[in-house]
Amino acid sequence: EGPKPNMWTEIQDNRGEWRVTDRYPQAGAERREFALGDALAHAGGSLQVSPVSPDVVFETEPFATEFRFGGQPQLHIDVTPEGSGGQLYALLEDCDGDSCIHVGHAIMDLRFYAGGTDYHVIAPGVTLNAKMEFLAMDVVIPQGHTLKLSLRSTGDDYLPASTSAPVAIELGASSVLRVDVVDPAAEHYFLPPQCRHPACVGE
């Protein structure tokens, strides 16, 4: 019994600032795509991921204005395993020159390349579209910084890949990073919750 409580979500971004929204990501968010090899230019390493190879690196141009995004970014990427399995670890960083900060990551056993819990048999040499999803994040990329994506076989806090077979990264229209843009002009999302009780309003 009693009045219905207000329903909202409190979000903290990677700089420690808080805001409030009725849903997350915010309603009507614009979705922006960064194609690998285009908006995310190939910046280093070969196009092959294996436990012994250097990172495959992609990076944007410096942003002309502050860029905010949140939710669970998606990385859908064409890959060609050279064995009966493989693993991909994707690291997103906010970079200012050579100084980078980890803002999010995702990891996938390629036997589950379609997403969900359905296991698939991997045929060597057959190209797949791996549908990866990052852990939830809320990120501010300052003006002049870049967004960097690094691909490797595993992360520092994860077990080694189940197979050492290399995985080739394929560029093209179906290899994209998708993010939900946070609009800082929507000021009501950045105001703290307001008390509407008569005792508050009368103060």
Regions found by a protein language model. Give the residues of each.
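Glycine/threonine-rich phosphate-binding loop and adjacent beta-strand/alpha-helix elements that clamp
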Residues: 1-203
